[in-house]
Each structure stands twice: as C-alpha cells, then as structure tokens.
C-alpha cells in the first residue's frame, strides 16, 4: 500500500544535493530509500545535469535498500541500479560505495543499533550523508500500517561529535523540532 511508504523531511533536500554535487560520487547507496527521493534527485543532478539523459549513458551506480515490503514501485526499478528489501542492520554490502545517504533512518532503531549501523556505513562508504531528528518531540509509534516508521531512539548532535564531520547543518521544523544533517567521512 503506497500510504505506508517512508519519506524524509523537506529540510534535507537542498543540503544533500549540494553535498552530492561537491563529492561527485560514482556510486551511492540509498539507505531506507522510501519513495526514492534520493535516487531520483541524484539521477537528476549527477546525470541529467551532466547531459547523460539516456539510462544506458548513466555513469553513477545508485543502489537502494529498504526494510518495508510496500516500498517498491516501477519508479525504483527505473531509477536504481539495484534495490534490496533488507534491514540495514543485517545487510552485508557486496561492494564499497562513495556515498551512503541515510536520512531519517537511524531514529527508527534503538540507539545501539543506530550507532552500529552508522559504523557499518562508515566502514563501507567514503562519505555518509546523515539526516536525523534531534532532541525531544519526535517520539511516535509506527503509522499508516508501517511499524518501521516508529521513532525508537532520541538523537542529539553531541552523539555525532566523535565522528569525522566535514559539514553539517542544524535546523528546525516549522513546529520547532530540531533536525541535523551531517557529512561524515568514512
């Protein structure tokens, strides 16, 4: 059912695209891809803006994974080179990636699993673009029939201080809730 597919906040879109255009990756893994926003936008700004319009001329490998079986649509099959229905906590990468995009994912697991997942991504990727709700007010159960949408951990910007952050943006929603974007080197 399309109503239970995960999505990401609006606050991350421009920042993530700026980071991707700066890195110029040849491979991307979209963690918790949901509707496919990052795959779609990466194709637009890394391929189409480089005048590679035909799918057979694309040079950037973009793979996706999502735990929710309701995620997959024909859009995913077109945009992504491969798409896996798997929980990132049990996923074993088959290759290194230049960039992992992991926005609005870590809060859906307990803090220990979130930190392990981040460690895994940093071990397998040169860059991790992380978006995560910060502070109080984000707690919620799953919704629209999707138990994977429950927020199970509260994150703070200080949780990420030990990592090699090259860029970050802290912002707030229209409701005053905190949100952080972090470009972390693997």
Regions found by a protein language model. Name each.
Residues 1-99, 112-119, 123, 145-186:
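Conserved N-terminal segment of class I S-adenosyl-L-methionine
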Residues 36, 105, 133:
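Flexible loop residues that form catalytic
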Residues 79-81, 106, 128-129:
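Conserved short hydrophobic patches within well-ordered secondary structure
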Residues 101-111:
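A short SAM/SAH-binding and catalytic strip from SAM-dependent methyltransferases
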Residues 125-135:
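Conserved beta-strand signature within the Rossmann-like core of class I S-adenosyl-L-methionine
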Residues 137-142:
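A short acidic, helix-capping loop that chelates divalent metal ions and anchors anionic groups
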């Amino acid at each position: 059912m399309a109503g239970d597919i995960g999505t990401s906040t609006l606050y991350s879109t421009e920042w993530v695209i700026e980071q991707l255009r700066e890195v110029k990756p040849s491979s991307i893994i979209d963690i918790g891809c949901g509707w496919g926003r990052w795959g779609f936008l990466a194709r637009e700004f890394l391929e189409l803006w480089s005048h590679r319009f035909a799918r057979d001329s694309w040079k950037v490998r973009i793979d996706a994974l999502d735990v929710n079986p309701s995620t997959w649509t024909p859009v995913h099959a077109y945009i992504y080179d491969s798409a896996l229905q798997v929980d990132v906590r049990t996923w074993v990468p088959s290759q290194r990636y230049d960039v992992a995009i992991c926005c609005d994912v870590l809060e859906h697991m307990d803090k220990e699993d979130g930190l392990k997942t981040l460690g895994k991504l940093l071990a397998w990727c040169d860059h991790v673009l992380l978006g995560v709700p910060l502070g109080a007010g984000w707690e919620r159960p799953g919704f629209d029939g999707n138990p994977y949408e429950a927020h199970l951990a509260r994150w703070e910007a200080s949780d990420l201080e030990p990592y090699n952050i090259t860029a970050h943006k802290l912002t707030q929603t229209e409701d005053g809730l905190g949100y952080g974007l972090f470009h972390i080197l693997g």
